[in-house]
Each structure stands twice: as C-alpha cells, then as structure tokens.
Amino acid sequence: MVEQNYTQNDGRRLFEEDRARALADPEFRAIYEEESSKRTSNLQLINLSDYETLAQTRIEPAAWDYIQGGSDDEVTLRANRSAFERIRLRPRMLINDSTCDLSTTVLGTPVSMPILVAPAAYQCLAHPEGECATAEGAGLAHTLMVASTFSTRSLEDIAQAATGPLWFQLYLYQNLELSAAVVRRAEAAGYRAIVLTADVPRLGRRERDARNNFSLPSHMSLANFPDEEPEPDQSSFFLPCTPTWDTLDWLKTVTSLPILVKGTLTAEDALLALERGVSGIIVSNHGGRQLDSALASIEALSEIVEAVNGRCEVYLDGGIRRGTDALKALALGARAVLLGRPIFWGLAVNGPLGVHHVLEIMRAELEQAMVLSGHFSLETIDRSLVKYT
C-alpha cells in the first residue's frame, strides 16, 4: 500500500500553503521541488493507481473534485474505465524477436511511444509550475503534449519549458479575433498542430463543482489572456461560442498548421470532419465531463476508424490507466492514446519528474503487454489481437 502522508487537514493546509508560496517565489520553488522529491523517493509508486492515491492527499478537496469529476451521474466517466474490461486480448505464441519498438510518429512528428499528454486546464491546481512542469516531464519521456487554451501558464512559457513537441488545444470564443490571435501565437511559438475541441456547445453539468462552488483560486489565472479580463457587463466575453462545421473552414483561414478535431464519437461526424480536411480525429467524450451516458471513448473507436479508413490519423483519450488499455486502443485502430487525469497525479506527487514517471510506467506496461501478446512492433498490432466479451 502507498504510504499515506498529509492526510490530516492541517497537513493538507500546510502543503497547499507551500505550493502557493512556491508559485510566487522562485527561490522557494527550488526548495519545494527538492523536498517533494525527498518525500516521494522512498515510496513504491508502481502503477497509476498508486499515483492517484497519493495525489489525492496533496490536492485541495474541491480542486480534486474538479480534476476527478464528471457530469451528472458520472455514468460516462465510469464507462470510460469499465468498457476496457469488456475487451480481452488474444495473445500469439512462439514469436521469435528480442527487441520491442514503441516509437512512432504523430502527424509526421517522431515520438518515443504512442502515449501522449492530453489537454487539461488549470494544471497549477496540482503543481506551482503547472503546464510548464508537464511540458518538461513529457519532454523527458520524448513524447508530445497538447496544451490547453485554459492553461495556467502561457502558451509561450510552456513552449519555452518544453523539450518535446507540442500541439495547442483551442476553444473558440464569442470574440473570434481573440481566438485567432491565440492560434497565431501558438503558431509563432512553435506548436505543430491545432486541436479544435468540438464537444462543448455548452459546459456539462458537473455536480461536484456545483456543490463545492468551485472556482479558480485567486493566485491563479488564465495565463493565455492576461490583458483580456472582461468587465462585469461583458460576461459573454470568454464564453465558448457554439462551433459548427463552418468553424473548421474559418480556422483553416487563420492557420496553416494541421488541424485535429477533438470530441468525435460517431462515424457520421468523422466523415464530416474528413470532408472539411482535418488531419486527425481525437475520439473523446471529454473525460466524461460533457454529455453523461455518451459512449465510452473506446466503444466509439472502431466505427470511427472504419469510417475514416486510413484517410486521417485517429487518436483516443478517456480511461487509459494501463498499458493493456493502450494496447487495446492501438489494436482497434488508434494511432496513439492520450493521458489526462494521470498527468495531474504525477504533477501533484513530484512535478515534472512525476509526470515523467507516470509516462514511463505506461511505456513499460505497454511494452510488457506487447511482448506477452506476441507483438514486438506497433506495425503488427491489429484488430485480431482483441475480442469483445
């Protein structure tokens, strides 16, 4: 069992005070990082569940609910995990190979494994450096990070901290010029693709947040909009506009970067996205945070892969917690998978090194699952590897 530190209210309060101070004081931040590493060095963090257990003791309860929660009854949130249990693996035997290669490309960019970092808002809730620490950890793992519009570190700061490739996830706003300006900034900062989130015509009803009256702490902000704080009578300034298929046409006039659409759960929408010239589709239900009772991401993957038929790359996020989960998604046609909540857990436990370790755990588990199933290259993984029960 993972050692339980900081479980008392006083301990959690002191931990939060240290983290807030580290956010404001660069000199104290170095001390904070060193002490965090010492606290975790003797813990046996073997899997992502271990990280989840420890992270909960280090994140303020309302923030934890924001990170972990889903919409309404959280049916889809739970289904994202349980759906993987209905898929079993069909291992092959006596395969003669001694090396296992996990390297691949995503939209032509080399990465060390088909496991990426999903866009997620407000990462300073878990660590003073937030998204910058995540970018550092992803770079250590030689994989790609997707940075959120709602980051608590600016997209430029994230790019400066990153040693690996970046994509930028975009929400569109009522003020389209603001959206266009953010896209241009991402392009100038070296981001390699734009990920349009298309499943938020309005925010899902997240009851945990409502009960907690959750809001971003006063010492944090939407770092990509430092000079655009709306006046009280401009409440719609930052509200997402309802995207339509014409939105993709507009976005293509703003940037020459490849565009992916995130939030697709049906073959019909995948085909419409293809007609609009997208370079990739991310099969996702927003981590179970939007429409409750929607399909689990892994349940939607097959029909989208079949509809696309190789005409663009298909990715998946939602519920990935084990290397076997990633292997099942790859077998069903995903180019790569993305991790969301586990990145927060790694951040809370040990900053960029925690993120790196979370990704390395997933790498080791995926490699183990591939070898035990008789596959030593991503190229040999196909649908014959899985069976629904």
Predicted regions and their residues:
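Short catalytic-loop micro-motif centered on adjacent basic/acidic residues
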Residues: 67, 145-147, 167-170, 259-261, ...
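Glycine-rich active-site/cofactor-binding loop and its immediate structural neighborhood
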Residues: 111-155
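N-terminal flexible/basic segments that precede or flank functional cores
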Residues: 1-43
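An N-cap/entry alpha-helix motif that binds or orients negatively charged groups
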Residues: 43-111, 206, 213-243, 379-381, ...
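Short beta->alpha linker loops
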Residues: 71-72, 149-153, 174, 265, ...
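Alpha/beta catalytic cores of nucleotide-metabolism and tRNA/nucleoside-modifying enzymes
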Residues: 43-85, 296-389
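Short, charged beta->alpha transition segments
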Residues: 17, 99-108, 144-158
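Alpha/beta enzyme core
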Residues: 122, 135-136, 140, 157-161, ...
